[in-house]
Amino acid sequence: MRIHILGICGTFMGGLAMLARSLGHEVTGSDANVYPPMSTLLEKQGIDLIQGYDASQLDPQPDLVIIGNAMTRGNPCVEAVLEKNIPYMSGPQWLHDFVLRDRWVLAVAGTHGKTTTAGMATWILEACGYKPGFVIGGVPGNFEVSARLGESDFFVIEADEYDCAFFDKRSKFVHYCPRTLILNNLEFDHADIFDDLKAIQKQFHHLVRIVPGQGRIIYPENDINLKQTMAMGCWSEQELVGEQGHWQAKKLTTDASEWEVWLDGEKVGEVKWGLVGEHNMHNGLMAIAAARHVGVVPADAANALGSFINARRRLELRGEANGVTVYDDFAHHPTAILATLAALRGKVGGTARIIAVLEPRSNTMKMGLCKDDLAPSLGRADEVFLLQPPHIPWQVAEVAEACVQPAHWSGDVDALADMVVKTAQSGDHILVMSNGGFGGIHQKLLDGLAKKAQAEEE
């Protein structure tokens, strides 16, 4: 079968392209911006890429077109597909129909930690000999790709609540039919497609409804939004994580780089790993609980996490210059910002200076729905720098004024980088947070710090 994918360079759609190729299909695709690293990964798999959406790419006609959720009516290829009656479907539907239908699916859903937790679950299964398939929103550090078919019945998927396509406004995860479901947490997000928290809870309950009776749902006992969702009706086994739940994690070090796994009042494993932060400890415990459902002994799962490498952009060290360390993180919601800063504070200690540099880039952020929570979420930083995005209905200056620590802002990435470089001193830790590229600010900071060091020597 010849399959053409519209919007192929996104992580999810690129992952589907790799799976389709592994199944023996001829695969082509197009995107508005054909860019690495995804373009490089796809070309290595023998997938031809086309820049832009000129309708001529559909001649000769493919057997099937998979349409990404960024595609809208008016797109030349979308219009040609509809006009010529070319068979089409969304990515999540294709994934179910051609890959997941006969697999034991372990799905990881929630507002935060999906990529990390899915990567952990995948690595546990891999390290314990299960050879799972997976589709994950970032490339897990222990693997070279974001998706593969695997060699067993088990398949791990990052289960996103975003919509499927212009013709299917349900959340992607309703197509995945998991037998093991992790619900990490639930907060209001994706304000561009959801009106309120109840609208998201409704979609999460659709997901809960399709887990089999002998399937298992694992979730934190202290998450009120998930409790409300589960109270709408659950027909599957449940395991709770937390102080009053079945599972607990107990820190052995302040930065959570070592911790114990407890199940029903008994210690069943111990994790010593390269990650830090209570949020990662929580993610790891969820992954261990999910792996147990498919047959992995918790002690073995805990040992496997000792060699886990996180996906890029999760408190990732980008470099050091002039005694200043620069980190990058994907955090783009107040809860994630708070957790990431707490993790870094635990890592570097209470006296080291942390400089937080934030780009409010997600749709929810741009709409201003989180702005009142931003200043409190930045509380563990010693100094704050904010980028003012263009054309948004609020000013980051309001957040800067609400911060208890010194806070600064600029509408220009270069100017912001210069401000940070001037402020930074040897021994400081700069944490850059954005769900985008932030105008290449990481390298600008490292270059600026190196120049500053050179000038000081002269």
Model-found features: residue ranges?
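Acidic-glycine-rich active-site phosphate/pyrophosphate-binding loop
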Residues: 251-267
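C-terminal accessory "lid"/substrate-recognition subdomains
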Residues: 260, 279-280
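Generic beta-sheet signal
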Residues: 30, 52, 91, 135, ...
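Beta-strand->loop->alpha-helix junctions that form or flank phosphate-binding loops
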Residues: 50-53, 91-96, 134-138, 233-254, ...
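Phosphate-binding loop of NTP-binding sites
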Residues: 19-23, 43, 57-60, 69, ...
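Short, polar loop motifs at secondary-structure junctions
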Residues: 32-35, 53-55, 71-73, 221-225, ...
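ATP-dependent carboxylate-amine ligase
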Residues: 1-34, 38, 43-49, 61, ...
